[in-house]
From Swiss-Prot:
Molecular functions (GO terms): 4-hydroxy-tetrahydrodipicolinate synthase activity
PANTHER family: 4-HYDROXY-2-OXOGLUTARATE ALDOLASE, MITOCHONDRIAL, DIHYDRODIPICOLINATE SYNTHASE
CDD domains the record matches: DHDPS
UniProt name for this protein: 4-hydroxy-tetrahydrodipicolinate synthase
Subunit structure and binding partners: Homotetramer; dimer of dimers.
InterPro entries for this protein: Aldolase_TIM, DapA, DapA-like, Schiff_base-form_aldolases_AS
Lineage of producing organism: Bacteria, Pseudomonadati, Pseudomonadota, Gammaproteobacteria, Moraxellales
GO cellular component: cytosol
GO annotation, biological process: diaminopimelate biosynthetic process; lysine biosynthetic process via diaminopimelate
Record's function text: Catalyzes the condensation of (S)-aspartate-beta-semialdehyde [(S)-ASA] and pyruvate to 4-hydroxy-tetrahydrodipicolinate (HTPA).
Site (Part of a proton relay during catalysis): 54, 117
């Protein structure tokens, strides 16, 4: 593959936020708040932005909205940091269309979640990703999150996919450091291995991971950036010192299905309106105190 593919591999590192998609109370995308969040994340040191991933409510945006939000990200970021576009689907043809739209918009990389609900076998997973890789000329990242998709991309399948030149990375959201470490051993020479689990991401960095695609960074981007910048240079004492102040958020921001708690937190911080799409609903009142206390502990309120 071209040097552009090698270049993006060197830039897929550090603290990478899976940004929420801000919405008005009627559920429409709030582009003004989205611009503000993008600028804030970059100012706070976030290394990469993920548009319309799981945390961005990809499952409930229409295909047109999905592509529109990705295009807006790219246009507003203007090359300041890489934009990773969530373009996965459980319909291969839809995933190809979304990925092509992201490539046309100028996204730096496509994030492709494993097909959910229809539970393909490993050969189906391989053929799904192979079809997208062959159809669209853009760096692509595998996304394994079996807790949501109910399908697990096996290591052997990842090894096969690593031979396809435009698959450049994997986001491993299994939460298993041992598994991530094994991936680094077998495909680390070909793929960038990233954590997709805030709670174990720093531990994965200690064994060769390159960064973290984070929910928590929605709320504390500077702390997460400082943590993973220190980790990248091998200074884990400094990383832990910053991380210890905010690591409770990794638990509390999942007190309900993500991104419900993160959206509540950002609303409480005055950064977004009270908008979310069904079937997700606003944070239950009995959990407000948990998030409020977590924000106070992180010096955010």
């Amino acid at each position: 593959m071209s040097t552009a593919y090698d270049d993006i591999k060197t830039r897929l590192q550090g603290s990478m936020v899976a940004l929420i998609t801000p919405m008005l109370r009627d559920g429409t995308v709030d582009y003004k708040r989205l611009a503000d969040l993008i600028d804030w994340q970059i100012e706070q040191g976030t290394h990469c932005l993920v548009a319309v991933g799981t945390t961005g409510e990809s499952a409930t945006l229409s295909m047109q909205e999905h592509s529109d939000v990705i295009r807006y990200f790219v246009q507003h970021v203007k090359g300041r940091v890489p934009v990773i576009a969530g373009t996965g689907a459980n319909n291969t043809m839809e995933a190809i269309k979304l990925t092509q739209d992201a490539a046309d918009a100028g996204a730096d990389c496509a994030l492709l979640v494993a097909p959910y609900y229809n539970k393909p076998p490993q050969e189906g997973l391989y053929q799904h990703y192979k079809a997208i890789a062959e159809a669209v000329n853009i760096p692509q990242m595998l996304y394994n999150v079996p807790g949501r998709t109910v399908v697990d991309i096996a290591q052997e399948t990842v090894e096969r996919l690593a031979d396809l030149g435009n698959i450049v990375a994997i986001k491993d959201a299994t939460g298993s450091v041992a598994r991530g470490e094994q991936l680094i051993k077998v495909v680390g020479d070909r793929l960038v291995v990233l954590s997709g689990d805030d709670g174990s991401a720093l531990e994965l960095m200690k064994v060769g991971g390159k960064g973290n695609i984070s929910v928590t960074a929605n709320v504390v981007p500077k702390a997460m950036s400082e943590t993973f910048t220190a980790a990248l240079r091998g200074d884990f004492d400094a990383a832990n010192q910053v991380h210890d102040v905010v690591k409770h958020l990794h638990r509390d921001l999942f007190i309900e299905s993500s991104p419900i708690p993160a959206k509540y937190a950002l609303h409480k911080m005055g950064m977004i309106d009270k908008g979310i799409r069904l079937p997700l609903v606003w944070l239950a009142e009995q959990h407000h105190a948990t998030i409020d206390t977590a924000l106070v502990r992180a010096n955010l309120l």
